[in-house]
């Protein structure tokens, strides 16, 4: 799949509705676009734009309706893509969420970042 690969706040253009709801209107700057896993986009989307909020991620996944194939082993896949991502999210993430530095394993960090069942 062709993916944007740099879905940061400055590449998403939106507009507030009269009711105060933000709506995406455009995605810009496809200079980093690559062929890759669709969930590669989730790394920056979740860790930067959603600020690692598991409830927001769960709502996004519910609306997006990924295939069972993509959801199988989701936490592990998402953490692998986080570790491989060209944009290193960890410095910013640990600065905003210092408690994450207390994780004693990658499995624990993966669970705290990506296990949407924790948000219920």
For the regions a protein language model found, what residue spans apply to each?
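The feature marks helicase ATPase cores and/or their adjacent C-terminal helical subdomains
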Residues: 1, 100-101, 106
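Active-site acidic catalytic loop and adjacent metal/ATP-binding pocket
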Residues: 1-42
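Glycine-rich, phosphate-binding/catalytic loops in enzymes
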Residues: 19-21, 43-45, 62, 107-108
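Active-site activation/catalytic loop segments of kinase-like enzymes and analogous catalytic loops
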Residues: 39-70, 82-99
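Catalytic core of nucleotide-sugar-dependent glycosyltransferases
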Residues: 57-58, 110-112
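Alpha-helical scaffolds flanking conserved acidic
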Residues: 74-81
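Regulatory N- and C-terminal appendages and interdomain linkers associated
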Residues: 114-120
């Amino acid at each position: 799949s062709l993916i944007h690969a740099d879905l940061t706040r400055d590449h998403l253009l939106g507009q507030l509705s009269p009711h105060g709801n933000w709506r995406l209107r455009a995605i810009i700057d496809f200079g980093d676009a690559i062929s890759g896993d669709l969930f590669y986009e989730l790394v920056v989307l979740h860790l930067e734009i959603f600020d690692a909020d598991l409830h927001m991620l769960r709502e996004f996944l519910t609306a997006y309706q990924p295939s069972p194939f993509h959801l199988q082993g989701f936490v592990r896949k998402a953490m692998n893509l986080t570790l491989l991502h060209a944009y290193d999210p960890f410095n910013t993430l640990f600065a905003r969420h210092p408690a994450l530095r207390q994780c004693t394993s990658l499995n624990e960090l993966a669970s705290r970042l990506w296990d949407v069942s924790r948000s219920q």
